[in-house]
Amino acid sequence: MKKSLIQKLGLLGVVSFLSYTAAVVFAPLAYPGYNWMAQAVSDLSAANAPSLALWNQLSALYNACEVVCVTIVCIGIQGQKTRLLRTGIYLFAVMEWISAVGYRMFPLSDSGYAGAFQDVMHMVVTALVVLLSIVSLTVIIIAGIKSRDCCSYGICAAIALAMMLVGAMGMKIVPSEYFGVVERFSVFAATGFNAALGIHQFCMKSKEIKE
């Protein structure tokens, strides 16, 4: 069956995920001494990071495709599934937009945390992103429990939330030399779930899509 344009655009979530993965994997090559097991991913895109140029090149499709994908999903899901699921997806979309705009406006001024104004704002953006991520994913999980039609969304949301919690708790528990390992669970959770939403959009039956 021929896919509509709005279905095909859902695959931009996968493109976003691959772009982000490429940046996380290859940007350290331009950062002498970077220890991925101990350092955060955000160190790679800090304002004075030697890897910033390569990071921007590799992640060029990440933010653009991510926000387009989640916006397309919001359009495609209108009037479909349950109101609870739609609410969760809308909240997740707000989080994605805050993340895309906020981290571009306020990158870390130095690798780590230097205490400058933009570092403080970076932390504020992070707090909003984390809060909205937890709330939106929880709502989607509940929607999946309540409706069999939303079950696959709920499963994906549960996996993403579990990854976030593993990352958050792990960063407090594991030795500092393994901080980067557990932190990556958190950073890949959101972009991974975005890709899952895009795949759901692509696979949605054409009769369910509003052109």
Question: What positions do the PLM features span?
Answer:
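Alpha-helical transmembrane segments of multi-pass membrane proteins
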Residues: 17-36
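Aromatic-anchored segments of alpha-helical transmembrane domains
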Residues: 21, 95-102, 161-171
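Terminal transmembrane helical module of multi-pass membrane proteins
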Residues: 141-211
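Interfacial segments of alpha-helical transmembrane regions
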Residues: 6-14, 81-94, 150-157
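Internal transmembrane alpha-helix with an interfacial aromatic "cap," most often the third helix
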Residues: 61-88, 135-146, 198
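Membrane-proximal helix-loop-helix units in multi-pass membrane proteins
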Residues: 99-140
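Interfacial helix-start motif at the membrane-water boundary
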Residues: 44-64
